Amino acid sequence: MSEATTTLDGWYCLHDLRSIDWAAWKTLSSDERGQAVSEFLNVVEKWNDVAATKKGSHAMYTVVGQKADIMLMILRPTMEELNEIETELNKTTLAEYMVPAYSYVSVVELSNYLPADEDPYQNPQILARLYPELPKANHICFYPMDKRRQGDDNWYMLPMEERKKMMYSHSKIGRQYAGKVRQVISGSVGFDDFEWGVTLFADDVLQFKKLIYEMRFDEVSARYGEFGTFFVGNILPDEKVEKFLHI
């Protein structure tokens, strides 16, 4: 049996994507819509308070295309907190005019290839990646993925050293986009339908295409990568929520 990779796990992660039922939303009066928006922003303000204490983070984006209208990415120390956030949101008036489009549950993850005598949880750089403050980048790209397990192309049957070598080559491509693309990898084995979630942030949306296309030619992706649905969107600052929902 091949050796399993040890992982470092950080904050739990929820990607919550919803579509707006615009036809139903239009039936409300202007005052009713305003009250619903204010109620929602009060919930978001609670998230801001948590982020200010470094006990979680979140991001809010509009989604381009017909897969969804809005994407929320929430990071918290426990799965229970994610559940509480989702439930509180579902109880708002605005949620009555939202249709669930997609969700993904995972935990921020790093592969532990550090020396055995080093405690990774004492490394500030690693802690910043396990418990990240999500950037306010202009654009987001999220997609789930698996490692292939078919015939000779079975990632999990490869020796540890071979997997390490290929992942090192794979990561070199990503490092070329440092300063252009911020990446958050989250593990979801046993949590959701795929094995990982990949969330990318960038101010220049074209960098997503360039990075992912270049990685397609790397063996890790070309031979062993299997991908789910891609979602791409634009940042939705708190102060623009009312305009986004205005009729």
UniProtKB/Swiss-Prot annotation:
Gene3D superfamilies: Apc35880, domain 1. Keywords: Heme, Heme biosynthesis, Iron, Metal-binding, Oxidoreductase. Coiled coil: none annotated. Its cofactor is Fe-coproporphyrin III. GO terms for molecular function: heme binding; metal ion binding; oxidoreductase activity, acting on the CH-CH group of donors, oxygen as acceptor; peroxidase activity. The active site is at 143. Fe-coproporphyrin III acts both as a substrate and a redox cofactor. It holds the Pfam family Chlor_dismutase. It catalyses: Fe-coproporphyrin III + 2 H2O2 + 2 H(+) = heme b + 2 CO2 + 4 H2O; Fe-coproporphyrin III + H2O2 + H(+) = harderoheme III + CO2 + 2 H2O; harderoheme III + H2O2 + H(+) = heme b + CO2 + 2 H2O. The keyword Oxidoreductase applies. It comes from the Bacteria. Involved in coproporphyrin-dependent heme b biosynthesis. Catalyzes the decarboxylation of Fe-coproporphyrin III (coproheme) to heme b (protoheme IX), the last step of the pathway. The reaction occurs in a stepwise manner with a three-propionate intermediate. HAMAP family: Coproheme_decarbox_1 (MF_01442). This is Coproheme decarboxylase. The gene is chdC.
